[in-house]
Every structure is written in C-alpha cells, then in structure tokens.
Design a protein with these regions (language model features):
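Membrane-proximal alpha-helical signals and transmembrane carboxylates
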Residues: 2-387
Length: 387
C-alpha cells in the first residue's frame, strides 16, 4: 500500500510539472524583424519607421522550394513615437513580429540633425528592441536602405551586418551598438560617432550595392557633420580601434609610393599633461606590422632600409591622425575621441574648472602625436621581385 501511495504521488507531481503550450506561436505565424530604419516625417513631430523582416514559412529548405512570394517583408509606418510605430506595425501584418534577431538600426540624416534623444529613449526602453544591435547613419532616407535588395543576399540587414563584421578586421569604420551609443549620449565628455552607409551608384553591368563611407559626428544627440574614410581611419588610430588594416607608404629617395604594410597589432595611450599651467594631450601610438608588397624594386635587406620604412609608415599614421583631429577639433568642435574623460580621470580638480566650458576648451587643446612603428617581417621574400 505504501509503494502504491508513493507511486500515485510521483504521478501527480509529474503531471503538475508538465508545461503546456497554450501560448505557443507556430513558425508560420511569425515574422522575424532583422532591421529598423527611422526617418524624419513629413509633418512636425512625426517619424517614419521602417521594419524589415523575414517570413520563415516562405524561405526555401532542402525539402521545400522557395515560395513564389518574397520571404522579405518591408513595412513603413508614420507615427508620433517608437511605441506608436509598433502599434501601427502590428496593424500592417497578419503575423507576430519577433525582434530577438534584430541586428541593425538605420537613422536618416534629416532626423539625426534634429536630434535623436526622443526616439532613442523609446527604442532603449522598449523590451522588443535589442540593445546590442548596430546603429548606423545614412545621408538619404533609412527606408531606402531597407527597401534595397542587394545581389549577395535578398536581406539587406544581413548584408550590412556582414559588412560591419568585416570592418572590425580591416580597420575602416567604427562600430557603435545601440548600447554604446546611449552610453556616450549620457556622457558628460564624449559624444558618439556612427558609421555611415549608402547605396552605391551601380557600375556597368551590375546592380547598385550598399557600402559604408566614413562616419557621422555627433555633438550631444545631434549630427553635426561627416568624416571621410581617411579621416575616419585617423579617428580609429586615436580611439584604439584600428584592427588589422593596410598602410601604404613610399620609400625616401625612390619613385616607390606603394609599399604595403599589414597592421598586425597596435596600441594607443592618451596621456593628459599640464605644462606651464596649460592642459595638453600626448597621443602615443605604437604599431607593429609586416611588409606585404614592394612594387618598385626597393631593397629592404638592411637595418637602415627597414628603419627608413618604419619612419615612412609612422609619418603616414601621424598624417592620418592630424587630419582627423583638425576636422574634429576645429570644424566640428566636439569631443568624440574621449580626451575629456582622460583629463577628468587624471586631473579631477582641474577638470572641475573646465567641465562647464569643455565645448570651448576642447578645440584649443594642443595634441602632441608620437608614433612608433616596428616592422617584424618582410614576408616570404626580402627584396622586390622587380630589379
């Protein structure tokens, strides 16, 4: 009797612990949001929010051919706020939107210049949106980017996401997630900088494509201007985000202009100093690389020739950094490089005196740029194959 009683208790407990499926959503009832674009609306205080999503039931598998209908669904709604746009989006689709896989947020230029605080709050506060998704800018409309189909994949969000992943390895543009963007908006010293993407003009025989082209510079929550690709790389040197790109330099006393170096590793130290009562920044950059191309028969088989190349690459890095600083400090006058936070940390008492007027002080900060390059290898051969 005792064993029978225990058996009944176990059965009852097992039944109680079973989970039900009363709130399950079948795959054919879902659409997976992959990207969100936000533009300025036609009327004041309106925004246009574009949602790009995948409809799984229309995707092809080895056992099922693709549907004749596209598996990409793009919807644009005009709304007063981000929350309002979600309500209107639900009215425009017969399926349940899933936001867990959203990778991309694209902001149009007109809206970014007016300020992003109002809708960034709505995105970050709403549970549906991922804070780890990348935030990007475009000079035109974000809706155009998300409606664009690219040759490599029908899903422009996947294509853009892959571009950003690759950029981390080739030192071309900064990567800013929604989370890091919000942290900089909340900072008292550092403003955000965001990668710019664009629809590239079609080349002969090919469709138009999507690519990145420098970055947008913010002052607080407003876009104030753009950096070119070269100026952006100067910024990446300063902020220690350079990754593994390629440097080109000439060789003194020769016609060579295209000796190529693969960046292997680098590090940057931003060191605030006080000289004669004046705050300045010492920017120390160390870079290690390998020769990857030598096109003009330059002999690099001696310590002197290696040193000359190292000096040439150091000069090129310094040029990129100074060009970027000139644009950032003198034209845009906004601290996107983190000098203020470094001064605050090292000289807290002096920082109190300049914090309220940092926007006026930052453009006048003197920056001393020191670069050291170390070439650790010339590749598989020493000299050029061209005599």
């Amino acid at each position: 009797v005792k064993k029978k009683f225990i058996f009944i208790i176990v059965i009852i407990l097992s039944i109680i612990s079973l989970t039900g499926c009363w709130d399950s959503i079948e795959l054919n009832q879902r659409e997976i949001v992959t990207a969100v674009g936000i533009d300025k609306g036609d009327e004041k205080s309106n925004i246009i929010v574009t949602f790009q999503s995948i409809i799984p039931e229309r995707a092809s598998t080895p056992l099922r051919p693709a549907s004749e209908k596209s598996n990409i669904h793009v919807v644009s709604v005009t709304a007063k706020s981000i929350t309002d746009s979600l309500v209107k989006y639900h009215k425009r689709t017969s399926k349940t939107p899933e936001f867990q896989h959203n990778r991309i947020y694209v902001i149009g230029e007109d809206l970014a210049r007016e300020g992003v605080n109002s809708f960034i709050d709505g995105i970050f506060r709403t549970y549906e949106f991922r804070s780890r998704g990348w935030i990007l800018l475009c000079k035109g409309k974000a809706s155009d980017i998300l409606h664009k189909r690219v040759e490599a994949t029908a899903i422009s969000a996947d294509y853009i996401g892959n571009l950003i992943n690759i950029s981390n390895h080739v030192a071309t543009v900064p990567t800013e997630t929604l989370h890091t963007f919000l942290m900089k908006l909340s900072s008292k010293t550092t403003s955000p900088v965001v990668t710019q993407i664009e629809i590239e003009a079609p080349k002969e025989g090919n469709a138009a494509d999507i690519g990145y082209n420098g970055c947008g510079v913010f002052k607080k929550d407003k876009l104030v201007g753009w950096l070119t690709m070269n100026e952006t790389r100067g910024l990446l040197w300063i902020t220690n985000q350079i990754g593994k790109g390629v440097l080109l330099s000439g060789y003194p006393g020769t016609a060579s202009e295209n000796i190529s170096e693969q960046i292997v590793r680098s590090k940057v130290k931003i060191n605030p100093k006080i000289t004669n009562g004046k705050i300045m920044i010492s920017l120390d950059i160390w870079e290690e690389g390998e020769i990857r191309e030598n096109d003009k028969g330059v002999y690099i088989n001696s310590p002197e020739s290696i040193k000359a190349l190292e000096d040439g690459f150091a000069t090129e890095i310094k040029r990129e950094v100074k060009e970027s600083l000139q644009k950032i400090q003198k034209e845009y006058k906004t601290d996107i490089v983190g000098f203020g936070s470094k001064i605050h940390k090292k000289f807290p008492s002096q920082w109190k005196n300049i914090e309220a007027k940092w926007d006026e002080v930052f453009p006048e900060i003197e920056v001393e740029v020191n670069v050291e390059v170390k070439l650790r290898s010339t590749g598989k051969i020493i000299n050029s194959i061209t005599p």
